[in-house]
């Protein structure tokens, strides 16, 4: 990516890696039960949807603003691509452990609670992405920031949804884990760390301040709207 200084295939490559890892786990594991099947399906659905959405977005926009500064610095750009590999493996570690586990415990409350969390998180992420895409597609909004829909309750509702859906995967996976596999429950914590401190939120907050930091409306939006956890805006 650095030779061409392009980030066009970053998210697509990551999504295809998720899909390949899940398909490999399914094809090599003879004990796939209902829990493993649902976790596999959910990760495949998420990866296919997000990968396609982000790839088409960067192709239409011509760039991903998160990478504006990163891609001009070799070591930081290389670190970002390397971190992408860790992103894939650690993020779905709990899911992979459950899919390949031989500990076929009965389906119970954790399974159904995880499904509810995943559907809730996935729905929020999809709606938030569509709302922002529709906002940016309206030429009258060029150069403006979105404050409508879910974006009126959170500055990054899409990332909130992603965190919740991965918590759902870990909750579903939990009963099937044994021994060292419990370490994979770090997965949702890694997602939180990555989205807040390394990628998404951190980069977009910095970018937003550079673009609209002197805008009184933006300052009001920052003051009244939570960074991540949605809430009704304070008047």
Predicted regions located by residue number:
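C-terminal ends of transmembrane helices
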Residues: 1-6, 52-59
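Select subsegments of transmembrane alpha-helices in polytopic membrane proteins
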Residues: 12, 75-88, 155-162
């Amino acid at each position: 990516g650095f030779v061409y200084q392009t980030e066009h295939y970053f998210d697509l490559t990551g999504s295809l890696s998720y899909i390949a890892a899940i398909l490999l786990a399914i094809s090599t594991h003879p004990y796939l039960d209902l829990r493993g099947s649902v976790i596999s399906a959910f990760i495949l659905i998420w990866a296919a949807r997000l990968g396609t959405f982000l790839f088409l977005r960067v192709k239409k926009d011509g760039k991903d603003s998160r990478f504006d500064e990163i891609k001009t610095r070799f070591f930081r750009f290389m670190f970002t691509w390397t971190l992408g590999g860790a992103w894939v493996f650690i993020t779905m570690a709990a899911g992979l452990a459950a899919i390949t586990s031989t500990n076929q415990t009965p389906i119970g409350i954790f399974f159904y609670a995880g499904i509810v969390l995943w559907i809730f998180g996935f729905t929020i992420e999809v709606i938030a992405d569509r709302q922002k895409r529709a906002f940016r597609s309206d030429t009258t909004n060029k150069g403006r920031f979105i404050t409508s829909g879910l974006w009126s309750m959170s500055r990054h509702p899409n990332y909130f949804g992603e965190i919740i859906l991965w918590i759902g995967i870990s909750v579903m996976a939990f009963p099937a884990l044994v021994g060292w596999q419990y370490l994979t429950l770090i997965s949702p914590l890694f997602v939180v760390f990555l989205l807040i401190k390394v990628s998404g939120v951190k980069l977009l907050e910095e970018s937003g301040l550079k673009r609209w930091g002197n805008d009184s409306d933006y300052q009001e939006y920052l003051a009244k709207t939570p960074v991540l956890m949605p809430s009704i805006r304070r008047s």
